[in-house]
Each structure stands twice: as structure tokens, then as C-alpha cells.
Amino acid sequence: MVSAPPTLQDQAFRSLVRNEVLTVSDAECLIREFFPPLFKEASTQKKPKTIMILVEHWPYPCLHVGLLIDKPNFQIFQAILDGVDTWLKRKYRPRMGRLKKVDFRDAQHHASLDMQDEREGRDYLVGTLPKKQIVEDHSRTRKERLKLFHDLSFMSSLHEDKHQTLLLEWAKERTSFLHLCCEKLEIGAVEVSKVRNVLKFLQPELIKELKLNTVGNLSKLAKFVPFIRKMRNLQKLMLVRTFGTRTFTQEEKQNISKIISLFCKLSCLRHLTIDDVYFLTDQMKELLRCLEAPLVSLKITLCQLSQSDLESFAQRWNYSQLKHLCLRGVTLTNLDVTPLRDFLKRVAANLQTLDLEDCRMDDSHFRTLLPALIKCTQLTSINLYDNDISEDVLENFLHRTTNLSQLTTEMYPAPSEVYNESNYVIVEIFIQICSELMNKLMEVRQANSVCFGSSSCYDCDNRYLYEDDGDVTLCLCQE
């Protein structure tokens, strides 16, 4: 597609920025609608001086950096902070007094806002403010602190983010003038004391999403519990990679109890992910009992569950709004999945996605689950890869999926008959059986995206895939 030639206004903006002729007095008289395009152009041309002047005189209540420019370089980032700094130090702000918020979060974040928040978040693009905003601007005192939004990540002490390091040092010195607001926080295997010092000047009630990756250290995870308790509006929690021995010391038992009891305080929690966490075994009953708010998504991956853990799913807890369930990598080989079947029946009316990949189920497990699976009529996605299911059992399931018409993504394991004694795929049999199963499915209902996949190849770690259009993807060893 041929792009439209630049307008005279575009050319004027480029020239103005390129020659760096914008002065403070010019900015004070500049039409407010010119600020966003000039800001974008100054970022494109990497003109920090112009950026600083535009920020200092920003005429809108919100400066959404993340919507205007994608990942500013370090020089531009520093210029934005310098502009904010100059704005904060101004004694009188007749025009500039409108600025209430500087937001570095990216466009993806703003795309997820609801309509009301989105309208407020895009005030810098319109010529007039909502009446409610105008009234509030006159009623607020000048002592109100500026809010600066930025997601924070402490995932690696070896590769620190220069932008974030600068921001934290800058914000720490200006806590009397601004609030550093973080809605998405990631904490990895860094020094606990370092992160705790940062948490002290954040507003915990603003944090909505938290990822904790303590890389095997249970005591580190437990030390964060007092801070997490204060995150009363936390909606999404991810506990990742905490592993150790199956024999707990007294101190470890106390830490586990402290972590599990935390869930009683998270009354807004809607999305929970527990990935590769060793202490979860025999703790599911207490954890689920502690949940106050109804979960929308529950993801438990690479964890070892006991029979009592599985039974706890079918007991009383707040699952009335559950739409997404993932048990990927949870080995069910030696467990009775009847409680899981009963649980799936109870959430069938709402469940939209189900991921049971690599649960190591066989025909007996699948036969047990089948009556529940066919009742999940709202499913849009199902993943059953890496389960040892025969052709007959899989065909029986597909034949009974008439009511699963909402499915848009279906991933099924290649039947056990496609493997030889060494568990390698026999390509001709793979293609033949998968083709027959696909035809059986098409006789039952119209499918959107269906794929039969083998287990990963021992040599290249890729799958054989048979898709609904008849396309066959061989593992790299066969190509």
C-alpha cells in the first residue's frame, strides 16, 4: 500500500522539530492539539530538548507516553522525566496545572481498558474535557501529587533495566511531589531487601497484577507475604518456580502456612497461576477454601497434585464464575479423576477454555472425564495433547461433541496406535488415522481449527501435526 504524502502541517512539524526551534514561549502559546503530533515527531527524530519543553507545558490532564510513542530510548525517557521535573518545580501553572497523570504503560494495556477508563485515558486526543473533569480541576488543590504510572520488573539482578533504575532513583527523591503508581509488578530472583525498599514507596493498593518467580527459594517468597497482604485490589497473581524437597522442615511448614493464608486477604483476586511450585501438594483444599472472590481463571502447571488435592476441586469453593482452567503438566496417571469429572460438570455452563496437555492420562481416565467434557458447551478452546488415548476412545469422544459448537481451537493427541514399540511415530499410520478421525469429526459438526499432534520427538523435540485442511507437519528429523 502506498502511503499518503505528508501534509503541509506534517512537514511543518518535522521542520520545527528537526531545527529544534521550539522555545518555552512558543510552547506557552501553542495550540493544544499540536502537542501530541509534535511529541511523536520529537521522539522519532530523537530530540530530547523538544520533548522536555513539550512535557513541561503539556496542556492535557494525562500524558500517555505509551500511547504516543513505543518504548522511548534512554535519552528520550530521561528528557520526559526532566520535563516532569521542571513542571513539578513551577510555582505557578495557570495553563499547565491540568496535568494530573503521566503514564508510561504501553498501548496493549490501554486496549484492555473498559470504555469509561479508555475515554478518560485518551483525553489528550480531544479538544474539550468532560464536564466532570473540569469541575474536579477547579476543586483540587495544587498540593495534590502528580501520578506517574509505570510497570516494574525485578526479574534479573544481572540485566537491570536502565530506564527503570533511573525512574526509581528519580521518583524516590520526589515522593513529596508525586506518586509512583505500579499496576503490574514482576519480582524474580533478586535481592529481597532491594525490592522491599522499592515496595515501601509504592502504593500497594494500586497493584493489580503480580508475578513472583523466586527460583526455588521458599523463604524469599514468604518474606513478601506482608507486602502482598496490602495489595487489596490485586486481581492477577502468578507464583512461579518455587521448588525443593518433599520433606519439609518446621520453618518450611510455617512459611507454607503463611503463604496459603495470604489468599484469604486477596478479596479481588480473579486470575491465579501456580507454575512449578513444589509445596502445592496436599495444600489445594486449604488454598481453595481461602479464596474469597470467584476466580475467572485457574492455571496450575508442572505441579504434583495428590488424590486429596484433586478431590478438593469438587468440594465447596468459589468457582461459580470460572471460565478458564489449565492443568498442563499435572500428572494424573496414578490418580482417580472422578473428582475432576464432577468439578467439570459443575463449571460446564461457564467454562470457555480447558487445557489438559501433558496430564499423562490413559483411556480409563478419558472415559471417566468424557461425560463431563461433552457438557462443556461454552468451550471455545480445548487442548488434550500428550495424553495416551487410543483411536477408539478418541473417536467416541469426537462423535459425541455435537453440542460443542462454540469451539474455535481444538488440539487432540494422536492416538496411541500411531507409535511403534520404541514410541516413534509411524508416519503412514499417523496420516491415515488422523485423516479418518478428522473425517469423523466433520460428519458430526463444522469445525474451525482442529489439530492432531503427536508427542514431541525424542531427537528434535517437535511434534508431527495433522491439521483440519489436511496439511501434515513432520518433525524436523523427517523433513
UniProtKB/Swiss-Prot annotation:
Q: List the top taxonomic levels of the source.
A: Eukaryota, Metazoa, Chordata, Craniata, Vertebrata
Q: Which SUPFAM superfamilies match?
A: RNI-like
Function of the molecule = Promotes maintenance and self-renewal of pluripotent embryonic stem cells (ESCs), downstream of LIF/STAT3. Maintains the pluripotency state of ESCs by repressing DNA methylation through the regulation of UHRF1 stability. Mediates the proteasomal degradation of UHRF1. Is required for the establishment of the blastocyst.
Write out the ranges of the repeats annotated as LRR. 96-124, 179-203, 204-230, 231-265, 266-291, 292-323, 324-347, 348-375, 376-400
Q: Which family does it belong to?
A: Belongs to the PRAME family.
Which pairs of positions does the record mark as disulfide bonds?
A: none
Database matches in PANTHER family: PRAME LIKE 14-RELATED (PTHR14224:SF17), SIMILAR TO PREFERENTIALLY EXPRESSED ANTIGEN IN MELANOMA-LIKE 3 (PTHR14224)
Q: How does it assemble?
A: Interacts with UHRF1.
**InterPro entries, per this entry?**
LRR_dom_sf, PRAME, PRAME_domain
Q: What is this protein called?
A: Preferentially expressed antigen in melanoma-like protein 7
Q: Which UniProt keywords apply?
A: Leucine-rich repeat, Repeat
Q: What happens when the gene is disrupted?
A: Embryonic lethality due to a developmental arrest during the establishment of the blastocyst.
Origin organism of this chain?
A: Mus musculus (Mouse)
Q: Which GO terms describe its biological process?
A: blastocyst formation; negative regulation of apoptotic process; negative regulation of cell differentiation; negative regulation of DNA-templated transcription; positive regulation of cell population proliferation; regulation of ERK1 and ERK2 cascade; somatic stem cell population maintenance; stem cell population maintenance
